[in-house]
């Protein structure tokens, strides 16, 4: 009965346009009752309205597209060679241009998931560098496509991306595949984890190496306001400690009008 009264109160707030208070009530209900269909349904309607209002409030074409593309989860349908990639095609095109120019011998990917991105990077390496490898790290490989598991240019590690064995293996791979590194951070998006990834890479990278910090668009940069501190805030803290480590590649970030890697295209100094 308590939840029913809360649902009625949240619905009344929603109908009055007070979406934030309605969202707060629904979230509290779901925290204690994950399968409450009324709260889940109303929360979906609230998020749709918030997204719609956010898009309507801006005249920036790139921002409008970013919000539409992200909030409608079009990114969740993107694939490479039939394998889910979960990325922005604009970012992927940017990556291939960066990789073609950089010609890395080693690509580091923190966060494999289905493996579409992993396969994409391996496909690029086949075109540009005879002696090269993708090293992809994730805590769970159960969703990986067989194409990824069996690819000769892909090495997988089942581990947290901040674990010491990851650093040790990168040192070994750097000896085996000398040359530039392209690294992409796309695993756990919580601030402290991303900060740990950046700190792990700090002694391993050389001048000219390239790092992309993905999903720094969350927590209101510009999507998912209120998500909590994530990659963007991790970069802010990192640069407060090490202000001279990287140069931001603003031209790349701005090239297509929007990116999932807000402020996250970085060249090692």
Regions found by a protein language model. Give the residues of each.
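Helix-start (N-cap) detector for alpha-helical repeat units in TPR-like alpha-solenoids
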Residues: 3-4, 37-38
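TPR/TPR-like alpha-solenoid repeats
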Residues: 12, 46-50
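S-adenosylmethionine/decaboxylated-SAM
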Residues: 78-83, 89-269
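Alpha-helical segment of the N-proximal tetratricopeptide repeat
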Residues: 4-28
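Mobile, glycine- and charge-enriched loop segments
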Residues: 49-93
């Amino acid at each position: 009965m308590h939840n029913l009264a809360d649902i009625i109160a949240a619905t009344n707030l929603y109908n009055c346009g007070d979406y934030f208070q309605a969202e707060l009530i629904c979230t509290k209900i779901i925290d204690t009752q994950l399968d409450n269909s009324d709260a889940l349904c109303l929360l979906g309607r609230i998020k749709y309205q918030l997204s719609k209002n956010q898009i309507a409030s801006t005249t920036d074409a790139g921002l409008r597209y970013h919000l539409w593309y992200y909030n409608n989860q079009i990114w969740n349908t993107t694939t490479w060679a039939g394998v889910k990639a979960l990325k922005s095609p604009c970012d992927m095109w940017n990556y291939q241009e960066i990789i073609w120019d950089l010609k890395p011998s080693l690509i580091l990917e923190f966060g494999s998931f289905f493996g579409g991105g992993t396969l994409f990077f391996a496909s690029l390496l086949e075109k540009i560098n005879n002696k090269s490898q993708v090293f992809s790290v994730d805590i769970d490989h159960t969703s990986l496509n067989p194409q990824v598991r069996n690819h000769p240019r892909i090495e997988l590690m089942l581990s947290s991306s901040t674990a010491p064995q990851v650093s040790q293996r990168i040192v070994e791979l750097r000896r085996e595949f000398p040359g530039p590194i392209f690294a992409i951070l796309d695993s756990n998006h919580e601030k402290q984890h991303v900060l740990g990834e950046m700190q792990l890479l700090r002694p391993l990278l050389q001048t000219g190496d390239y790092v992309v910090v993905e999903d720094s668009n969350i927590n209101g940069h510009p999507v998912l306001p209120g998500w909590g501190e994530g990659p963007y805030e991790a970069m802010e803290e990192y640069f407060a400690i090490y202000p001279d480590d990287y140069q931001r590649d603003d031209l790349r970030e701005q090239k297509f009008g929007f990116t999932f890697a807000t402020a996250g295209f970085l060249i090692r100094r």
